[in-house]
């Protein structure tokens, strides 16, 4: 499970060891609508259902009822210049079912305040574009004259 080698036991040495697996688990927003107690994760290809369940229960204290996994094939792309084909890496997805009493809602990363700020920034950008276009239109009849040489 892990590629780390631990030192050989010698009498008198402290034996406090931390086991760090080479696994990773990433929370993914599902493409299709899922029930509220089903959570989708992208995980490393080496993880099994049992590994995913233990990972969530032991490290994060998340109660798990069922785990289903699937492997999504990576897409293929043709190079535009040389014409050879490359394949993206396959990804493994784990669908974790929580108890019926537990519900998971995907966190709102961009709250309404941030959305409002983004809209304000877009509006100010549009105003700047409009003013620049008006400035360019004003100097159309004087080609070759620098912009600072205006009234």
UniProtKB/Swiss-Prot annotation:
Keywords: Mitochondrion, Ribonucleoprotein, Ribosomal protein. The lineage of its organism: Eukaryota, Metazoa, Ecdysozoa, Arthropoda, Hexapoda. Residues 120-143 have a biased composition (Basic and acidic residues). The gene is mRpL23. This is Large ribosomal subunit protein uL23m. Component of the mitochondrial ribosome large subunit (39S) which comprises a 16S rRNA and about 50 distinct proteins. One of its GO terms (cellular component) is mitochondrial large ribosomal subunit. One of its GO terms (biological process) is mitochondrial translation. Belongs to the universal ribosomal protein uL23 family.
């Amino acid at each position: 499970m892990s590629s780390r080698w631990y030192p050989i036991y010698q009498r008198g040495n402290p034996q406090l060891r931390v086991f760090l697996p080479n696994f990773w688990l990433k929370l993914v927003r599902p493409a299709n609508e899922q029930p509220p107690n089903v959570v989708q994760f992208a995980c490393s290809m080496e993880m099994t259902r049992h590994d995913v369940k233990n990972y969530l229960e032991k490290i994060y204290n998340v109660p798990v009822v069922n785990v289903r996994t699937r492997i999504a094939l990576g897409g293929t792309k043709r190079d535009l210049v040389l014409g050879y084909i490359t394949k993206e890496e396959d990804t493994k997805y784990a669908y974790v079912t929580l108890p019926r009493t537990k519900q998971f809602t995907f966190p709102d990363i961009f709250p309404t305040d941030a959305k409002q700020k983004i809209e304000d920034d877009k509006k100010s950008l549009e105003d700047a574009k409009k003013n620049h276009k008006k400035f360019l239109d004003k100097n159309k009849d004087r080609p070759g004259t620098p912009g600072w040489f205006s009234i």
